[in-house]
């Protein structure tokens, strides 16, 4: 499910500003900070916060409350939320909470190429493209249906894709430029305050 223009320019600049402060205040590979996934692909965990330039620790919802509300409202109101469980009544479905908010950066040679990649343990995932499509080559976001059909999603800056987390999804290899995205995962456990795996 694609939501066109979910984030506007102001929202996106707030995300970039916060991610840059978190990155600047956290050494590479420090637990809970930012990590290199593969050559050409790194991510920063934003949900639990980071040390700002004034040396105060602040979380993403504290710094970007309007953006966080917009993201969560879109996910909770998505019809995919109801299809995450095989139950007929929304009242019987468990509440969803934030598992992680991640800022992803892909440069030439980077991608997420895994024919079986799913978000294990998560219920609903959103990926928002932060970069304008003309700023990179390749790097299309794809989802794979149960019958094996692959859909390439051509996204503009601020567009979001929402999908059931157990759906196979990938990012094709970036051939040039820089592709940035914001990923939000919701799960049925309590809100996560550390890295993605706790």
What are these regions (language model features)?
Residues 1-93:
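Non-heme Fe(II)/2-oxoglutarate
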Residues 80-198:
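Catalytic core of non-heme Fe(II) oxygenases with the double-stranded beta-helix
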């Amino acid at each position: 499910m694609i939501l066109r223009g979910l984030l506007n320019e102001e929202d996106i600049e707030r995300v970039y500003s916060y991610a840059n402060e978190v990155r600047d205040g956290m050494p590479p590979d420090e637990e809970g900070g930012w990590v290199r996934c593969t050559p050409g692909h790194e991510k920063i965990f934003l949900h639990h916060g980071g040390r700002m330039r004034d040396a105060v620790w602040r979380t993403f919802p504290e710094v970007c409350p309007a953006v966080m509300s917009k993201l969560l409202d879109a996910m909770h109101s998505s019809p995919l939320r109801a299809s995450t469980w095989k139950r007929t009544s929304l009242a019987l479905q468990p509440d969803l909470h934030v598992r992680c908010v991640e800022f992803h950066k892909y440069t030439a040679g980077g991608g997420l190429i895994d024919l079986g990649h799913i978000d294990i343990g998560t219920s609903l995932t959103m990926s928002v493209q932060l970069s304008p499509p003309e700023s990179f080559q390749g790097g299309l976001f794809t989802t794979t249906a149960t019958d094996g059909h692959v859909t390439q999603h051509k996204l503009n800056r601020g567009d979001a894709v929402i999908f059931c987390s157990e759906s196979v999804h990938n990012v094709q290899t970036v051939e040039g430029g820089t592709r940035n995205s914001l990923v939000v995962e919701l799960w049925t456990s309590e809100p996560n305050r550390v890295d993605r795996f706790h």
